[in-house]
Amino acid sequence: MPIKIPDDLPATSVLEAEGVMVMREADAVRQDIRPLRIGLLNLMPNKVTTETQIARLLGATPLQVELTLVRMTNHVARHTPADHMLSFYCPWEEVNDQRFDGFVITGAPVERLPFEEVTYWDEMRRVFDWTQSHVHRTLNICWAAQAAVYHFHGMKKYDLPAKASGVFRQRSLVPASPYLRGFSDDFAIPVSRWTEVRKSDIPADSGLKVLVDSTETGLCLLDDPRHRSLHMFNHVEYDTTSLADEYFRDIQVQPEAKVPVNYFPGDDAKRPPENRWRSHAHLLFGNWINEMYQSTPYDIERIGKV
């Protein structure tokens, strides 16, 4: 099934060119089914790139998805045109009376700050609490995953001695998990972060389950059944060139920045990288949506009440 997004969203032409089925508003109303309502709280600097990445993965599943783009209420995006934000994004305070089958919260370029020093931290805490009454399934990515386990479980984040940047091998630890259906035992995922949360800090009574980790970069994916959440600490959604874009940006201000590990062929930044994680990105999002579809109420107003 296709993904339903605003007709004029820049992602529309990109996804259609890739063969992703995009549904126009007029076409959607003719289908006699309830689409899954999924919100995307986009905290990344380049909103257009990130919304396209997430829409690509949501739109590849067999179910009709209606995507709502959400921003923090009072935070002003500095790297995305104001008219784009005004046209396509809703402040969280304008949607917090609505219910969603799924909600995705992205990473943010604030991970080196203590959580309490992030300007929108108070609202972020309210968002996390709101997901418990208005969202059926939540997927937190990178900084949002760190923030969620700090908010719900008191797990601290730690500075790394150097930025973890590259494509690192990961291990599937719970093959029977519905979220890992179809996963290889060993696979690669992009990592791009300055901080980490540690397996040793997981509270014994938290109910958290480590689904995926790495001997090099630690925790990758946690299942949090009590909060109906998945916490993905890495960037499975990244495009082929995302790490390259970050690297070339970084060396403009930090010439000694290291080349992302296991990314460019032969670690030669002049050679185009190859994507080795695309299939597992689609598997994760497909499995997450399937689990959501199997258990979400048909009457969306019952979300949070059953």
Curated annotation (Swiss-Prot):
Positions annotated as active site in the UniProt record: 142, 235, 237
Chain positions of site Important for substrate specificity: 192
GO molecular function: homoserine O-acetyltransferase activity; homoserine O-succinyltransferase activity
Gene Ontology cellular-component terms listed: cytoplasm
Role according to the record: Transfers an acetyl group from acetyl-CoA to L-homoserine, forming acetyl-L-homoserine.
PANTHER family: HOMOSERINE O-SUCCINYLTRANSFERASE
Name used for this protein in its record: Homoserine O-acetyltransferase
